[in-house]
């Protein structure tokens, strides 16, 4: 996030100055989305790391020591875990740990004194996410967007902009509970010819009435996800990141479709990109997430 800058116009001015080599004052954001990598291999998952009850704790323990070498004024590390692992992960945090923990989403409604006291069966209100020890949440990930689109389609709803309105409620609930938000946007292959319209609506509707300094944008080129798909190249990512900054007054933008060892240096070379979202660290052989590979990706991206 940009430092000591108040208004969106001044943030955008600082971004333009940075592009022209005049100055640069930015925070890097390294996010980790652990999805459901906790599912054991014998059940169809990719977890070879630890027994399920210890999985979240092990990840924190194997990463927080090495991350202490980085300046917390220059880079933040947030790990987004499935809810079942948050308590053990929080318990594993050392004093002054460089790791912040986050949830993989929040519900669009919340508890409140004198209001709903917790009638949210199956749902995850932002209040409990904060109470569990989380500092951030992930909202609008392409997998969440696809789920919401599927539910709306089953209900016969053709207005897919409703997804952005639902996500806007989630963002507001998260911020009201004191959580930072990583808000994901992205276009499918069908939407790519009108990428600017699609992304513009995701930004304008999803962030309507939102306290933007509490939000970082994660860009997911959904059309590039999956085996055999061509990854977005540097020029395309740069174009989108510039568009997002121009539309939002200079909000921070991270690459959301896998910061990994083979693209870390390329992404680090893009001035408009402020970090990335790591997920799987190994894509062949024993596919999965491995803490030592996560740390190597960070080293490659930060150049340290």
Regions found by a protein language model. Give the residues of each.
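Conserved anion-binding
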Residues: 143-228
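Glycine/small-residue-rich loop that forms an oxyanion/phosphate-binding "nest" at active or ligand-binding sites
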Residues: 105-160
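Glycine-rich phosphate-binding active-site loops on the catalytic face of alpha/beta enzymes
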Residues: 35, 141-147, 272-293
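Conserved N-terminal beta1-alpha1 strand-loop-helix module at the mouth
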Residues: 13, 21-101, 108-114, 218
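Conserved, mostly hydrophobic/aromatic
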Residues: 82, 129, 220, 267
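Catalytic cores of alpha/beta
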Residues: 259-272
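C-terminal helical cap(s) of enzyme catalytic domains, especially alpha/beta-barrels
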Residues: 154, 283-304
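Hydrophobic faces of well-ordered beta-strands that scaffold small-molecule active sites
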Residues: 28-34, 77-79, 101-104, 137-139, ...
């Amino acid at each position: 996030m940009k430092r000591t800058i108040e208004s969106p116009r001044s943030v955008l001015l600082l971004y333009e100055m940075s592009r022209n080599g005049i100055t640069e004052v930015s925070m890097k954001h390294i996010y980790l989305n652990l999805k459901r990598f906790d599912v054991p291999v014998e059940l169809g998952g990719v977890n070879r790391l630890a027994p399920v009850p210890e999985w979240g704790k092990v990840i924190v323990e194997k990463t927080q020591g090495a991350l202490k070498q980085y300046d917390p004024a220059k880079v933040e590390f947030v790990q987004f875990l499935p809810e079942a692992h948050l308590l053990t992960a929080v318990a594993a945090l050392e004093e002054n740990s460089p790791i912040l923990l986050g949830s993989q989403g929040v519900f669009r409604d919340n508890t409140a004194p004198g209001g709903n006291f917790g009638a949210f069966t199956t749902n995850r209100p932002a209040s409990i996410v904060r109470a569990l020890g989380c500092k951030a949440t992930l909202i609008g990930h392409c997998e969440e967007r696809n789920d919401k689109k599927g539910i709306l389609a089953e209900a016969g709803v053709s207005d897919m902009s409703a997804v952005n309105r639902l996500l806007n409620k989630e963002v507001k609930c998260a911020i009201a509970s004191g959580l930072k938000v990583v808000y994901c946007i992205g276009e499918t292959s069908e939407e790519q010819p009108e990428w600017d319209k699609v992304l513009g609506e995701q930004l304008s509707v999803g962030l309507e009435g939102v306290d933007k300094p509490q939000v970082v944008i994660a860009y997911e080129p959904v059309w590039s996800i999956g085996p055999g798909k061509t990854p977005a190249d540097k020029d395309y990512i740069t174009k989108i990141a510039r568009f997002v900054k121009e539309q939002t007054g200079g909000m921070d933008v991270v690459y959301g479709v896998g910061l990994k060892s083979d693209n870390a240096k390329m992404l680090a070379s893009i001035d408009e990109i402020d970090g990335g979202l790591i997920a799987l660290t190994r894509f062949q052989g024993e596919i999965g997430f491995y803490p030592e590979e996560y740390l190597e990706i960070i080293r490659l991206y930060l150049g340290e």
